[in-house]
Amino acid sequence: MPKKQLPPKEERHKLFGSVPPKERTKPIEKNKMADLQNTKRDFLFKLDAVGISNVKYPVIIHSDLAPKEQTSIGTFEFSSSIPTMSKGTNMSRFMELLQEYSSSGMNVSISELKRFTKELSGKLEQKDATIEVSFPWFFERKGPESQSAGMNHADAKLSVTYDSNSGFSIDVSLSAWITTLCPCSKEISEYSAHNQRGNVTLEATLVEDFDEAKIDWKLALLEAAESNASARLHPVLKRTDEKMVTEQAYENPRFVEDMVRLIAADLYEMPFVSKFHVSCRNEESIHMHDAIASITYDKSSE
């Protein structure tokens, strides 16, 4: 049995600083409350983006790789521009619309986000709206010889902007891990060569009429990254697999510069990509520093 005789909970709250409510003088009816955000006046500058970020919600991901449908956690950012004559935006409307979509299952698809941004633009009474969602995308990966399976993942991002004047713009991004083996180390050494994990980030602007029913953009970017690496990463490797992966890496040495150029070539050949940015960071196994390289290319500039 407790030995202490404690005061009632209300008294404990008072002990730690709680005070009784004061007399209320401001209106409680919505139509009588001050609405500062909707104040119309010259506020000096138009704002490019106003909204909310770091919003986490469950989402449904569709994939051409197993698992074909998966539930993940989406991290959202919502925004719109506001003109000089508007003080602010209606922050609650971002969350209200997200909850509405989530209640029937929020699919992270280009078509869904197009519909969302156009509707959001109307609710905000602004000419544009942007939604960006980041999420971990899981995919099954089998050992090259044993076929022993496990799950890998990459960090994906999809951003859709609607503008009542110019239509939709679609940007995608994927960050994935790969293996790189140093060409210089292989060339100068009697045997062996140092190798390491590299992190590749591919950012691409898609054409407005991109057809996600025909092409899984996540898989297209993943293949561009992994197919140009010294070797792919695997969650499960038996001895026969490890031999194959090790030898493959030795046969395909890559500098960090090589990686971004080879990936850029693949993206350049994709007709549904209008511009892109590729960066690679190798966690050097024989140094304390990382090696980096990047490239940006806009096909429309040709």
Curated annotation (Swiss-Prot):
- Tell me the enzyme class: hydrolase
Q: Name one Pfam family in it.
A: GCHY-1
Q: What are the protein's GO molecular function terms?
A: GTP cyclohydrolase I activity
Site note May be catalytically important applies to 182
Pathway(s) per entry = Cofactor biosynthesis; 7,8-dihydroneopterin triphosphate biosynthesis; 7,8-dihydroneopterin triphosphate from GTP: step 1/1
Q: Write down the chemical reaction(s) this protein catalyses.
A: GTP + H2O = 7,8-dihydroneopterin 3'-triphosphate + formate + H(+)
Location of region: Disordered = 1-27
Annotated GO biological processes are: tetrahydrofolate biosynthetic process
Q: Work out whether the entry's keyword set contains Hydrolase.
A: yes
What does the UniProt record say this protein does? Converts GTP to 7,8-dihydroneopterin triphosphate.
Instruction: Please identify the protein, giving its name as recorded.
Output: GTP cyclohydrolase FolE2
User: What gene codes for this chain?
Assistant: folE2
